[in-house]
Each structure stands twice: as structure tokens, then as C-alpha cells.
A protein has these predicted regions:
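Active-site-adjacent structural elements that line small-molecule/cofactor binding pockets in enzymes
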Residues: 1-272
Length: 272
């Protein structure tokens, strides 16, 4: 299944393949994600061997779950062995039962994330030892705290599954936070749901990437206008069974790839 995912994504012309992160499939995790759940660094290392050009990313790695120097080492090795293809999307986590199972204090996950990211960057600065090369860090979190963390510690802000009005407002807040902290505005790299429908989806709760192919293409254009040069498409729509039978997801990715390429070729006069 993983090999087919990798080959499908690369053949369709996409630029990245991402994997999420859970160490223990506790009951709160199992409600959304089925077992087995693959460890991200091991899986991405294997995927590096069956792909040629796509970037390999986490969306997202739960930073407090692992010792930061171990993460720094694994990430550096993976980035080196894959030819510089690793992108590290990170988050603080949400599954309290999983934190309890790992013996990590849930209430301190934000502080731990900040400390761990700082330690990882310090480790990577030792180029003689880690030899990582540049590893982009995308900081997730649909909150002001997440935005502040992205401004202080990340290369990009990586919000997940949102509505367009919310994102427009959030981008303004992100810029204000960066200005207040006197730091550059991080890149905008959203992960959006991909759920194609035959009829238009309307209403204020419509998420970016949800609706007809025309709506999805318009959403991608709106994201471009907001400054996003990279968008992660997430065809998993909260039904664990879909991950075991991903034909619908592959079909949706193919439709978007075909139409997006055609649209850009028509508008710009050259294929993308």
C-alpha cells in the first residue's frame, strides 16, 4: 500500500509525500486513525528508497514524544540519505491518553515543543557531527500560540483543515505577530482537506478543498493569492476505513493534478 501511495503521488507530478505521527494507538487516537500506525522516520527512510524526487515530510511530528537529540539525529540522517528531501512538519499534539501512555506531561507539551525545537536546531548547527544540511521546519497549530511558535522557531506556518475566511483572518494575525516580535513572516504552507463532490458545497463551514473540482481549484488560487507556494492535500476525511481502501483518494488526487496542470498551462502558456 505504501509503495503504491509513493508511486501514485510521484507519477501524478506531486512534489511531496507526507506522513503523520502517533507512537501509541490509544482509544482517543483509534477513533480517528486505524492500526497499524507506521513510525514516521522509519517509514520515510523506506519511502526514500522507492521514490526519486518527491520531498518527504511529516504532517505532523509530535515533538514532545521523543528526545530532541534523537529526533535531530534521525532527521539529519534521513535528510542526508535522501538527498536533502526531508521537511519536518511539527506540532504539540492533542491525544492526552497517548501522552499519558508515553509518560509525557500533556499540560507541558507547548513548553516541551519549544525547548525541543531549540535543541534540535542547536544540534544541527554542529555540521561536523550531524551533517544534516538544511531541514525546513513547518510549525502546525491553528492558534495564536501556534503562530507565535512558527514565527519564533519555524520556517513556515502549517495550519490544518480550515475555512477560507478563518485563514484570511489568521494570516493577518500571523503578520501582526511577526511584526510585534520583529521577525520575518514565516511562509504559509496549509494542509487542506481534499474532498471532491458532484454538487457545490456551500455555507460558512465549508472547508478549503471541499466541494466540486472547480471550487477546489478556486481555493488553490485563493491560497496562492494569500502567499502560499506549497499546499498539502489531505484526502483522508475522518473515516478510518478510507485509509485501507484509498482508491477514492487516488482518484481525487489524479483529478486535481490533471485539472491544475491544465489550468496553469492555459493561463500561463506553458505546462507546470
Amino acid at each position: 500500500m505504501l509503495r503504491r501511495w509513493a508511486q501514485t503521488v510521484e507519477a501524478l507530478g506531486y512534489d511531496m509525500l507526507t506522513i503523520s505521527d502517533h507512537v501509541v494507538v490509544t482509544p482517543d487516537v483509534a477513533e480517528q486513525y486505524p492500526a497499524p500506525f507506521y513510525e514516521p522516520f522509519t517509514t520515510l527512510a523506506w519511502l526514500a528508497g522507492v521514490t526519486e524526487r518527491v520531498a518527504l515530510g511529516t504532517s505532523v511530528l509530535i515533538v514532545p514524544y521523543r528526545h530532541p537529540l534523537l529526533v535531530a539525529r534521525m532527521a539529519a540522517n534521513l535528510n542526508q540519505f535522501s538527498g536533502g528531501r526531508l521537511v519536518l512538519g511539527v506540532g504539540v499534539g492533542w491525544a492526552r491518553q497517548e501522552f499519558d501512555a508515553l509518560g509525557v506531561p500533556f499540560e507541558q507539551r507547548g513548553r516541551l515543543t519549544d525547548e525541543h525545537l531549540g535543541a534540535m536546531r542547536t544540534a544541527w548547527a554542529d555540521e561536523d557531527d550531524y551533517q544534516s544540511g538544511p531541514i525546513p521546519i513547518w510549525v502546525g497549530g491553528n492558534t495564536d500560540l501556534g503562530m507565535r511558535r512558527a514565527v519564533r522557531l519555524g520556517d513556515a506556518w502549517h495550519p490544518l483543515r480550515m475555512t477560507l475566511p478563518w485563514l484570511r483572518s489568521a494570516v493577518d494575525r500571523l503578520k501582526a505577530i511577526a511584526q510585534a516580535l520583529e521577525r520575518p513572516v514565516p511562509a504559509l504552507v496549509p494542509r487542506i482537506v481534499l474532498r471532491l463532490t458532484d454538487l457545490p458545497v456551500t455555507g460558512p463551514e465549508r472547508r478549503v478543498g471541499e466541494g466540486t473540482i472547480e471550487q477546489v481549484l478556486q481555493d488553490l488560487e485563493e491560497l496562492r493569492l494569500l502567499g502560499s507556494e506549497t499546499v498539502v492535500l489531505d484526502p483522508f476525511d475522518e473515516d478510518p476505513a478510507e485509509t485501507l481502501a484509498p482508491d477514492r483518494a487516488w482518484q481525487a488526487l489524479e483529478i486535481v493534478a490533471d485539472r491544475w496542470t491544465w489550468t496553469n498551462s492555459t493561463n500561463q502558456g506553458e505546462p507546470q
